[in-house]
Amino acid sequence: GPDDRPVDLSYDTLIVAAGATHSYFGKNEFAEFAPGMKTIEDARFTRDAILSKFEMAEEAADPAERAEWLTFVVIGAGPTGVELVGQIAELAHTVLPRDYRSINTKDARIVLLEGAPSVLPPFDKKLQAYTRRVLEGIGVEVHTNSLAIAMDHESITFKSPEGEQTIRGRTRIWAAGVAASPLAKQLA
């Protein structure tokens, strides 16, 4: 109540919307290198991180270092991951090209990793195929059946049917896996 005393309320149904957090599937150390996106603050951090990488690439003299700054890896090809790589591609190809002098933002390498056999795993197969075609058409590298097995501040290694591959790049964003929030776990 207004004087900070508890108030008893009656109800027929109580809905507790405690939210969710990221699940790194037992690889919690990945959180340091691939932040997730579940809150508005996460989204703002991700936006700022992406834009700052273009700035860092602009300042880099070494072509290999520049390529690392312009490499963006998104882990998880559900709706969040698919939308995110699409937005990064739009930024790189449409929004940012006139803003930089020493880099071509269209050279950005955008990679989408998914552990399942297709993008948008729970959706209809026609939508999955269409989405993959669209993403590849805008320059996104799509790797399905691919699991992140190691990462640090400069690279990610993943295992796929083709074997282990390492991608050097400074930006990794976690869009895979959802876990109950700490409050929801307590209530369960």
Sequence positions of predicted segments:
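FAD-binding core/adjacent interface of flavoenzyme oxidoreductases
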Residues: 1-71, 91, 162, 173
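Short glycine-rich anion-binding loops that position phosphate/pyrophosphate groups of nucleotides
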Residues: 19-22, 85, 178-179
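Glycine-rich Rossmann-fold phosphate-binding loop(s) that bind the pyrophosphate
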Residues: 75-78
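N-terminal Rossmann-fold NAD(P) dinucleotide-binding loop
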Residues: 81-82
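A Rossmann-like FAD-binding core segment of flavoenzymes
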Residues: 89-188
